[in-house]
Curated annotation (Swiss-Prot):
NCBIfam families: mal_quin_oxido, PRK05257.1-1, PRK05257.1-4, PRK05257.2-1, PRK05257.2-5, PRK05257.3-1, PRK05257.3-2, PRK13339.1
InterPro entries linked to this entry: FAD/NAD-bd_sf, MQO
GO biological process, one term: tricarboxylic acid cycle
SUPFAM superfamilies named in the record: FAD/NAD(P)-binding domain (SSF51905)
Example of a GO MF term: L-malate dehydrogenase (quinone) activity
Keyword Oxidoreductase: yes
Name of the protein in its database record: Probable malate:quinone oxidoreductase
Catalyzed chemical reaction(s): (S)-malate + a quinone = a quinol + oxaloacetate
Length: 488
């Protein structure tokens, strides 16, 4: 006998948690069930050690604003990401202010920086600063080529550096470090207190549509072969990170045809030595190597995890065919179907430089990888650093009318035409834009309910519907309010 519920959220990460809280705030009478394959929430991509945790706000990530062919830098994409991050930040602040999260310990003030180390990159960074400085959301950004000034911002990165090497840096004091694992756990604890049912160690075996439009999920207990649970729901969200593609394919919806996935793993060096970690307080992004994918931009990060400061450097791109860190090596081959084979072949052929880059990364020894860290931290001691494997990222491959198939970086909502099922595919900027992504998904899936949500959404997100960059006075008010509530 199937257990009936209004909403099923598959995946115990930041996306399901965010959507769950939004739905509970806007539709408190709806019954919600959250399913997670592992023994707890936030153990895959939302875990603090499996994501960059930058609070992506485009302050330091150079790949969001490349130099155009005309020599001009367009800040539009960076502004869009910054606006989205501020929507998330407002939502988190409201939940803290209303006592719905335990505290604000999931977010910390950590400056964001960009550091480049050759003349061409220094010239680019100056142009980027000039383009960004005129924008409200980036107005406090600083730029310098002065070695002493840069040393004040990031002393470890300048100590021992060649005096003749050109350097330039952007610095944004208002950057943050977000522990999405802690935030997810707090959100799910709140949901459990509101009656949301959580089912852990549950693997989705099958997804079927019934004649009345309901979705039926057959799940198995990963610890007990006899522990079957069947759920029947009128709305299904597939937010299982890299695992969402496999679930989307199981659903059989026509909108999911032609989608494929390309998994990329990431390695990082981690330093938990307090003496070193306390000397660096910034997230510092560099410029990506030629041919490197966007998720491989090198960065030396301050990370605050469970109240302790660490340093992380990476990522080093790798390849494993599983879609989740704790997934199966058969994930990629089993995801290849007749409807996505051609798009995947076309995308693979068009991205041979990326393939060569990944092969080169895979061949690197630990010593060769550490040499990259020395470019950013010249006096780094190998004994202080351990190499860890972060989470899997599954980049989207989709049909394209001209090219046959394209590899797409970013996130994408794939929903059934009637709004009864939605999946979130892709990766960066990911978690930092969870709130606007889930609000957009809700409007797409429940257009008839959206008008009744407007008032509460404006309470949850005080600047809802407003572009902060285009409303300077309102931006000052909202940014000051969220900074006070979140203690950043």
């Amino acid at each position: 006998m199937a257990e009936a519920t209004d909403v099923v959220l598959v995946g115990g990460g930041i996306m399901s948690a965010t959507l769950g809280v939004l739905l509970k705030e806007l539709e408190p009478s709806w019954e919600i069930t959250l399913i997670e394959r592992l023994e707890d929430v936030a153990l895959e991509s939302s875990n603090a050690w499996n994501n960059a945790g930058t609070g992506h706000s485009a302050l330091c990530e150079l790949n969001y604003a490349p130099l155009g062919a005309n020599g001009i830098i367009d800040p539009a994409r960076a502004l869009n990401i910054a606006e989205q991050f501020h929507v998330s930040r407002q939502f988190w602040a409201t939940l803290v202010a209303e006592g719905k999260l335990e505290d604000n310990s999931f977010i910390n003030a950590v400056p964001h920086m960009s550091l480049v180390m050759n003349e061409d990159h220094c010239s680019y960074l100056q142009k980027r600063y000039d383009a960004f400085k005129t924008q409200k959301l980036f107005e406090n950004m600083e730029f310098s080529t002065d070695r002493n000034k840069i040393s004040d911002w990031a002393p470890l990165m300048m100590r021992g550096r060649d005096e003749n090497q050109p350097v330039a840096a952007n610095y944004s004091a208002e950057g943050t470090d977000v522990d999405f694992g802690r935030l997810t756990r707090q959100m799910v604890k709140y949901l459990q207190g509101k009656g949301v049912k959580t089912e852990f160690n549950r693997h989705v075996e099958d997804i079927k549509r019934e004649s009345d439009g309901a979705w039926v999920l057959k799940t198995a207990d990963t610890r007990n072969p006899d522990g079957q649970l069947t759920l029947r729901t009128r709305f299904l969200f597939l937010g299982a990170g890299g695992g969402a593609l496999t679930l989307l394919q199981k659903s059989g919806i026509p909108e999911g045809k032609g989608y494929g996935g390309f998994p990329v793993s990431g390695l990082f060096f981690r330093n938990s030595n307090p003496e070193t970690a306390e000397q660096h307080n910034a997230k510092v992004y560099g410029q990506a190597s030629v041919g490197a994918p966007p998720m491989s931009v090198p960065h030396l990060d301050t990370r605050n995890v469970d109240g302790k400061r660490h340093l992380m450097f990476g990522p080093y791109a790798g390849f494993r065919s599983n879609f989740l860190k704790q997934g199966s090596l058969m994930d990629l081959p089993l995801s290849i179907h007749m409807d996505n084979l051609y798009p995947m072949l076309c995308a693979g052929w068009a991205n041979m430089p990326l393939t060569k880059y990944l092969l080169g990364e895979l061949r690197k020894t630990k010593e060769e990888r550490f040499a990259s860290l020395l470019e950013y931290y010249p006096e780094a001691n190998p004994d202080d650093w351990e190499l860890i494997t972060a989470g899997q990222r599954v980049q989207i491959i989709k049909k394209d009318s001209e090219k046959g198939g394209v590899l797409q970086f970013g996130t994408e909502i794939v929903a059934h035409a009637d709004g009864s099922l939605a999946a979130l595919l892709g990766a960066s900027p990911g978690a930092s834009t969870a709130v606007p992504l889930m609000i957009r998904l809700m409007h797409q899936c429940f257009p008839e309910r959206a008008p009744s949500w407007e008032d509460r959404l404006k309470e949850l997100v005080p600047g809802y519907g407003i572009k902060l960059n285009e409303n300077p006075e309102r931006a000052d008010e909202i940014i000051a309010y969220t900074a006070k509530v979140l203690d950043i």
